[in-house]
């Protein structure tokens, strides 16, 4: 704990880029949540643009009040 699941449109990231992204996210969580490196997990879930509405409907819109960074768009 914590676990972060990054959802985004498909990107062609190399394994090196994925590793760097995970390291950066982990560093932020260690700094701000006082987590241990061994407690952090990071997932990268790539969602096709035509399937993003489902992410919005199930994960973003219902939790808008709890989001610590809200999107600058609506659906």
UniProtKB/Swiss-Prot annotation:
Compartments reported by the entry: Cytoplasm
Residues making up the signal peptide according to the UniProt record: none
GO CC terms in record: cytoplasm
UniProt xrefs under InterPro entries: 4-OT-like_dom, Tautomerase/MIF_sf, Tautomerase_PptA
A GO molecular-function descriptor: intramolecular oxidoreductase activity, interconverting keto- and enol-groups
Pfam family, one: Tautomerase
SUPFAM superfamilies per UniProt: Tautomerase/MIF
Residue numbers annotated as active site: 2
Catalytic activity, EC: 5.3.2.-
Assigned keywords, A-Z: Cytoplasm, Isomerase
Main location: cytoplasm
Stated family: Belongs to the 4-oxalocrotonate tautomerase family. PptA subfamily.
Complexes and interactors: Homodimer.
Protein name per Swiss-Prot or TrEMBL: Tautomerase PptA
Organism: Klebsiella pneumoniae subsp. pneumoniae (strain ATCC 700721 / MGH 78578)
């Amino acid at each position: 704990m914590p676990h972060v699941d990054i959802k985004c449109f498909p990107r062609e990231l190399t394994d090196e880029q994925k590793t760097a992204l995970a390291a950066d996210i982990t560093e932020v969580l260690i700094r701000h949540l006082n987590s241990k490196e061994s407690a952090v997990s990071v997932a990268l879930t790539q969602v096709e643009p035509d399937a993003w509405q489902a992410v919005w409907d199930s994960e973003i819109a219902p939790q808008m009040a709890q989001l610590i960074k809200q999107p600058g768009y609506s659906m």
